[in-house]
Amino acid sequence: WTGLLLLGAAALPVTWAAVLAPGGPAVSVSLLIMPIPFVAVGALVYARRPESLVVRRLVAVCAVVPMATAAAVLLERAAHGGDAGLLWAAVMAQHGTVVGFVLAVVGLLAIFPTGIYETPFERAMVRLAALSLLLVPVAAFVNDPLPALKTESPLPPIHNPLAVAALSPLAPLIAGALEAVSLLV
């Protein structure tokens, strides 16, 4: 859990560097500072009660928010003339962090406030949300071009170097599932 929180904290300077470097995307100041309280809250609650399942799930939410922000900023930067490899990686990172955020929130809400699953339905919902995380790597094998989440600027089709042509009939299903998960956010 400490490593996850450190990844979230490391995403902060990545976001700032991508925005503040020459040619960076124009974003609001609130986007740059919004993830800071998430990292601070995650660190504070984890320092106080690292054994608590509720705290660990909250740490996951707090760590994924700055990672998702960094992925979105990197995608905007890559869309403005960046290299295609970075654009592909940024789209996959954005999908992964959005689905990870949904999973972390579902996991937290399922056990809040007691720290245990109170019904089998809650456990089933967390397992279903965890399965949705598998959509991201599956999308890497079936979709070409990759579907991108909505951004400030329209993106050109993003070529996927990992796509397997034989799996392309599954592409609309996976793209729809990724879109459904992103609509939950």
Language-model features: where?
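Alpha-helical transmembrane segments of multi-pass integral membrane proteins
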Residues: 1-185
